[in-house]
C-alpha cells in the first residue's frame, strides 16, 4: 500500500472513524495528547504573557549625581522629595512594582539616564 493510497483512504473517512483511528494510533505508539503550545498565534497564554504586570524596578546603585537621580526617581514614582531622597540613599531599593515589561523598561531607562544603575526583575 503506497502513501497515496493511505492518504486517499484517510480522506474518505468520517469524523467518527478518524477519531477512532487517532485513538488507535495513540495506543499503538504510546502517544498522549498534549495541550497546544502557548506560543501559537491567537493563543490566550500568549496574550496573558504580554499583559503580566509583575515586573519590579530596583535601584541598585545611586551613582555620583544623586540630585539628578533623586529627580528621576521623583518623576517616575510621584513621591515627594524626602521620600525620593530616602529611596536613593538606601540603594539598593525597590523603585516601583506591579509594572508591565514596557513600563519597567521605561522607568529603568529614565533612572539610568540620570546616572544610576537599575534593574528590572
Curated annotation (Swiss-Prot):
Record Pfam families: Ribosomal_L12, Ribosomal_L12_N
Single GO molecular function: structural constituent of ribosome
Gene3D superfamilies: 3.30.1390.10, Single helix bin
GO annotation, biological process: translation
Keywords, alphabetical: Ribonucleoprotein, Ribosomal protein
Family: Belongs to the bacterial ribosomal protein bL12 family.
Assembly with partners or alone: Homodimer. Part of the ribosomal stalk of the 50S ribosomal subunit. Forms a multimeric L10(L12)X complex, where L10 forms an elongated spine to which 2 to 4 L12 dimers bind in a sequential fashion. Binds GTP-bound translation factors.
Name this polypeptide is given: Large ribosomal subunit protein bL12
Encoding gene, per UniProt annotation: rplL
